[in-house]
């Protein structure tokens, strides 16, 4: 009975979305406030019905209701309860319903916070959000219904994919979805501004708060995903240039460009075109990311759906959103933009340069991600575009981004003090010395490493950004700029962690039997013993290592190989000793008999700085959003 109630709630939600997309529009264009004001009540109704639907699905997982085909395919009675609940969004149908639920949260939030604003504009925005909700609700009803029954019910479920049985994967998709879907708000606001022929400056401050929160969650989702890839997939890296990773990166880059563009638009009335365009594309690329994950069109470790027909529907939604919004943008832009002149060598000019670089990075990522699919669709054969392409593009672009970031702090909005600018420029000298010292120390610890010029340049610029950011605000930190300080420091720290761990880490593949040792740089790994253990829904082979540094005990590390009976899958669980200055990392490979295994030993310097920098970026966005709310309340 409960699953039927969940499906019925989904039908009611679809009806509410349909009414929301039509009734307020009638009120707006016929000047009938009573009909216009229905936007708020219908938004709350949609949120309630969607919440009931996702809640019933989660309850079905928690109670092992294997009469639901979706539950039977993605859960098991032996699965720990928190993984059962997380399995709600572990497959295609549940993830799309969760996507819709997240969209309903943003819809309700906008309805709540806009109730005292311009009623006509807010109702138009809510109605557009309702139209987006309607599209995805119809998609779920006809192509991705998670409430389908199966009779007779299987005695046991197929279990959740072992790759997803991890604490990181409980929070990673929700954070990404909140970030992705949040861009729908600024998308709808921009469309409303185009419909009412308003400039982006008129809504810049209101839009900026929504973008900050969306970008905050997207940043946390990406950071958590990179952390999961690092410790769960067992390949020693944190970014694979996987199509799904690229999709989140493209949305993140566009969101970052939008934030900087909004700042200029609000302050000077410039960049109206940029602001509107970025706000439209950020959400369109979020939908594109959903298509990549759930269509199976591109090979990805994240793509768990292989039904291409559902992918075509998502692609159609992406096409309608993109073409429709860009067509309206093209029709309306001539009357929106007023010429605002500014010196090229200024803070505004530096932000313009930053936005151009971020746009090039997004386009380059898009081409690298979809070129293999186009190549195959045209029957030209198959081709793979991997890390060499993306690294060759992003290394010089990241160099420009870091320089532009520092320049925005060194320059003024209109007239720049040259003496002040060159003082900041001189900070490059100590930055270069420190960067060289960090690399020299890494080379001394492992003679197999080599000097990388580009890595040195990036490290120098990252330290320079850190110096300039702190120097600029050391004497008097204004609350208005505190978020910016945290975010810029976060970018610098993340870059330092990425460069040091990627270029100056140590790695070695070995085969070891118990009581054998292996040296890696300044560390000695001693394989103490081996045992077999039984988990709640798996069996495991466990190796115990003790690590010493120059003869002194340093760490105890325990890698595993787990076998999941129901899914008949073997997964490596890395052994990890996490430290502020670096991680020791062991991946357990094939069993060679009598306790002998193959292992991969890693040392990753400053890898933790990646996560620290990401958290600082998110905190920076949070502080900026709080500051905007404080200004609004004053």
Give the residues covered by each predicted segment:
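Contiguous transmembrane helix-bundle modules in multi-pass membrane proteins
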Residues: 1-33, 50-52, 66, 243-251, ...
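Transmembrane-helix bundle segments that line or gate the permeation/cavity pathway
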Residues: 50-72, 77, 86-111, 141-148, ...
């Amino acid at each position: 009975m409960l699953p039927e109630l969940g499906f019925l709630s989904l039908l009611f939600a679809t009806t509410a979305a349909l009414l929301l997309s039509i009734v307020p529009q009638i009120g707006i264009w016929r000047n009938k406030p009573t009909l216009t004001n229905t936007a708020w009540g219908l938004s709350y109704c949609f949120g309630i019905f969607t919440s009931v639907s996702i809640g019933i699905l989660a309850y079905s997982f928690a109670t092992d209701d294997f009469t639901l085909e979706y539950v039977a395919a993605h859960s098991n009675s032996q699965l720990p309860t928190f993984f059962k609940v997380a399995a709600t969004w572990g497959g295609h149908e549940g993830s799309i319903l969760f996507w819709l639920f997240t969209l309903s949260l943003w819809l309700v939030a906008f309805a709540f916070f806009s109730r005292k604003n311009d009623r006509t504009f807010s109702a138009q925005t809510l109605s557009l959000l309702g139209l987006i909700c309607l599209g995805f609700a119809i998609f779920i009803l006809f192509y991705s219904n998670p409430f389908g029954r199966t009779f007779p019910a299987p005695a046991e479920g197929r279990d959740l994919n072992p790759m997803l049985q991890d604490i990181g994967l409980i929070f990673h998709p929700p954070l990404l979805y909140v970030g992705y879907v949040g861009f729908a708000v600024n998308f709808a606001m921009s469309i409303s501004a185009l419909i009412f022929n308003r400039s982006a400056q008129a809504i810049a401050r209101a839009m900026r708060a929504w973008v900050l929160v969306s970008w905050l969650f997207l940043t946390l989702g990406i950071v958590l995903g990179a952390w999961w890839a690092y410790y769960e997939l067992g390949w020693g890296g944190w970014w694979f240039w996987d199509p799904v990773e690229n999709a989140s990166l493209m949305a993140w880059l566009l969101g970052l460009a939008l934030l900087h563009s909004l700042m200029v638009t609000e302050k000077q009335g410039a960049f109206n075109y940029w602001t509107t365009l970025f706000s439209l594309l950020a959400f369109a690329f979020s939908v594109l990311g959903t298509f990549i994950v759930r269509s199976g069109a591109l090979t990805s470790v994240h793509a768990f759906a292989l039904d291409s027909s559902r992918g075509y529907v998502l692609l159609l939604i992406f096409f309608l959103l993109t073409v429709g919004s860009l067509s309206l943008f093209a029709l309306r832009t001539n009357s929106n933009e007023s010429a605002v002149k500014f010196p090229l060598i200024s803070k505004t000019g530096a932000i313009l340069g930053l936005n151009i670089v971020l746009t090039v990075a997004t386009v380059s990522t898009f081409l690298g991600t979809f070129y293999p699919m186009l190549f195959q669709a045209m029957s030209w054969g198959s081709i793979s575009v991997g890390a060499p392409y993306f690294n060759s593009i992003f290394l010089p672009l990241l160099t420009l981004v870091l320089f532009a970031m520092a320049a925005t702090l060194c320059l003024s909005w209109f007239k720049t003090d040259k003496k002040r600018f060159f003082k900041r420029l001189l900070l490059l000298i100590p930055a270069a010395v420190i960067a060289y010292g960090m690399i020299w120390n890494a080379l001394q610890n492992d003679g197999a490493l080599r000097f990388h010029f580009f890595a040195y340049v990036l490290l120098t610029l990252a330290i320079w950004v850190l110096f300039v950011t702190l120097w600029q605000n050391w004497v008097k930190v204004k609350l208005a700029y505190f978020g910016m300080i945290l975010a810029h420091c976060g970018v610098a720290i993340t870059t330092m962690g990425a460069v040091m761990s990627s270029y100056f880490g140590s790695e070695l593949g070995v085969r070891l039997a118990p009581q054998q040792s292996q040296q890696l740089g300044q560390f000695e790994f001693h394989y103490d013993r081996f045992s077999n253990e039984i988990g709640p829904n798996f069996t495991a082979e466990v190796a115990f290592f003790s690590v010493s540094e120059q003869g002194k005990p340093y760490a105890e590390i325990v890698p595993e190989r787990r076998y999941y009976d129901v899914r008949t899958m073997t997964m490596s669980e890395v052994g990890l000793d996490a430290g502020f200055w670096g991680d020791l990392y062991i991946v357990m490979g094939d069993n060679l008999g009598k306790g002998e295994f193959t292992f991969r030993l890693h040392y990753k310097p400053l890898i933790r700085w990646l996560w620290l920098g990401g958290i600082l970026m998110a905190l920076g966005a949070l502080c900026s959003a709080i500051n905007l709310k404080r200004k609004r309340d004053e």
